């Protein structure tokens, strides 16, 4: 927000639109007295997983990120639809009480889109996508395209695409999703440089993430480490331009290219603190680029 704070001012609204902010105070009988309040734009929660709200207090930090993912998958798979929807609505109400009026949410199950669209946020609902087998990229994108072609489910929401992370999405799928985002003019988002294992996975391979993929029957034996940082890797796949990059805990060497490609970084301090990470979130450095 820019500009001076207006104390004891008047805000005029016509047909739902703000038409004037002034220091005068009229005597209009329809005026609302909010003299004990602060009027300001609503907050934006740029990254959330409301579909996982029902798992609150059921997960704890694990010895490794891969172990935490295993626990999340196990608990999440046992959640019934009613509990999940109840959790989504509870999380939404908590956001509203905190002043959030707009959000970017990762939606793993398209069946939940009508529920998400009914929450009355201005929102971008990112279709979270996982697929490390290169051969499956075409089929995955065909299913996503059907969703993108569907009827709008809320006038306040739009769809985006979210390849989950560099360690869970194949190069072919990344490229295909980038093209799909351009075709349908929808925003693209990805978890990037969240954990040190991710950087190791792309540089030389990481046994813990490889083992996790193999357990899920998701490993592609043809895949080879590209020898790049997460940011360099996404740039090589031509999807870095204007990307909404989530977490960005390990990007110190990539700040210039992020600025050049107009990457929007979304930092998640509560998540970072919960996992006990210490080197993270170069907010000021990135803003100064």
What spans do the regions from the language model cover?
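Alpha-helical scaffold segments that flank or form the walls of functional sites
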Residues: 12, 38, 54-120, 142-154
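Histidine-centered catalytic micro-motifs
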Residues: 41-53, 187-196
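Active-site-adjacent C-terminal substructures of enzyme catalytic domains
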Residues: 166-172, 224-226, 230-289
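Active-site beta-loop-alpha junctions enriched in small/polar residues
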Residues: 49, 108-109, 128-132, 164-166, ...
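Active-site gating/metal-coordination segments in enzymes
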Residues: 101, 142-187
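Active-site gating loops and adjacent loop-to-helix segments of metal-dependent hydrolytic enzymes
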Residues: 54-86, 120, 124-127, 195-240
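Structural preference for beta-strand elements that scaffold enzyme active sites
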Residues: 44, 101-102, 122-124, 156-162, ...
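N-terminal metal-binding scaffold of metallo-dependent hydrolase/deaminase domains
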Residues: 1-27, 38
């Amino acid at each position: 927000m820019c500009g001076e704070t207006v104390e004891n001012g008047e805000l005029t609204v016509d047909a739902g639109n703000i038409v004037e902010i002034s220091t005068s105070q009229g005597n209009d009988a329809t005026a609302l007295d909010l003299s004990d309040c602060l009027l300001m734009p609503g907050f934006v929660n740029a990254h959330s997983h409301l579909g996982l709200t029902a798992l609150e207090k059921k997960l704890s930090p694990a010895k490794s990120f891969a172990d935490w993912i295993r626990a999340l998958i196990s608990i999440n798979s046992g959640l019934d639809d009613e509990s999940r929807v109840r959790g989504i609505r509870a999380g939404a109400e908590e956001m509203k009480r905190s002043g959030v009026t707009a959000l970017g949410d990762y939606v793993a199950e398209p069946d939940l889109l009508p529920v998400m669209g009914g929450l009355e946020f201005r929102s971008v609902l990112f279709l979270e996508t996982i697929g490390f087998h290169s051969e499956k990229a075409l089929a995955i994108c065909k299913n996503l395209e059907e969703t993108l072609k569907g009827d709008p489910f809320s006038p306040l929401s739009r769809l985006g695409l979210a390849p989950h992370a560099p360690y869970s999405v194949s190069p072919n799928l990344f490229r295909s999703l980038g093209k799909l985002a351009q075709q349908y003019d929808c925003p693209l988002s990805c978890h990037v440089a969240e954990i040190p294992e991710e950087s190791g996975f792309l540089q030389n391979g990481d046994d813990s993430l490889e083992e996790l993929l193999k357990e899920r029957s998701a490993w592609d034996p043809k895949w080879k480490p590209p020898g790049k940082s997460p940011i360099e890797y996404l740039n090589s796949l031509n999807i870095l331009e204007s990307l909404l990059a989530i977490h960005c805990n390990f990007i110190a060497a990539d700040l210039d290219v992020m600025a050049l490609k107009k990457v929007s970084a979304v930092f998640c301090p509560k998540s970072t603190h919960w996992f006990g990470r210490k080197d993270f979130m170069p907010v000021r450095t990135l803003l100064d680029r």
